[in-house]
Amino acid sequence: MSTKKKPTITKQELYSLVAADTQLNKALIERIFTSQQKIIQNALKHNQEVIIPPGIKFTVVTVKAKPARQGHNPATGEPIQIKAKPEHKAVKIRALKPVHDMLN
């Protein structure tokens, strides 16, 4: 199996690409992205769903508590006790149909 790392667009590269496409300066683009991030964070804190066009959905979900259980160390086979995990909130990020359609 190949372990080659896929190419990634960095934050600065994204700012440059958006600036070139919109003909706005990078400082303004950075302020827009920072503002968007703050708005998303605030919405998620208030359990609101956020959809970013064309179709990326952020949702707050509650992860159920998990009791302590018996497990084993896969390397040695030695039995171990796995700690209980309390109920907590997590962010679920999902690509909607328009994003999936872009790939096909």
Curated annotation (Swiss-Prot):
User: Pfam families in the record, alphabetically?
Assistant: Bac_DNA_binding
What family is this? Answer: Belongs to the bacterial histone-like protein family.
GO MF, any single term = structural constituent of chromatin
Q: Which SUPFAM superfamilies match?
A: IHF-like DNA-binding proteins
Question: Gene3D superfamilies attached here?
Answer: IHF-like DNA-binding proteins
Q: How activity is regulated?
A: Stilbene derivatives SD1 and SD4 disrupt the binding between pA104R and DNA and inhibit the viral replication in primary alveolar macrophages.
Gene Ontology CC terms, in alphabetical order: virion component
Upon gene disruption, the observed phenotype is: Knockout of the viral histone-like protein leads to reduced levels of the mRNA coding for the capsid protein and to a reduced number of viral progeny.
User: Miscellaneous notes for this chain?
Assistant: Host antibody response against A104R protein is higher in asymptomatic than in chronically infected hosts.
Asked if the Swiss-Prot or TrEMBL record annotates the protein with the keyword Membrane, the reply is no
Instruction: Name any Gene Ontology BP term.
Output: DNA replication
Q: What induces it?
A: Expressed in the late phase of the viral replicative cycle.
Question: How is this protein named in the record?
Answer: Viral histone-like protein
Effect of substituting R69K: No effect on DNA-binding activity
Origin: domain of life:
Viruses
Q: What does this protein do?
A: DNA-binding protein that plays a critical role in nucleoid compaction, genome replication and DNA replication and transcription. Binds to both ssDNA and dsDNA with a binding site covering about 15 nucleotides. Displays DNA-supercoiling activity only when associated with the viral DNA topoisomerase 2.
Where it sits in the cell: the answer is: Virion
Q: Which organism is it from?
A: African swine fever virus (strain Badajoz 1971 Vero-adapted)
Q: Does the keyword DNA-binding apply?
A: yes
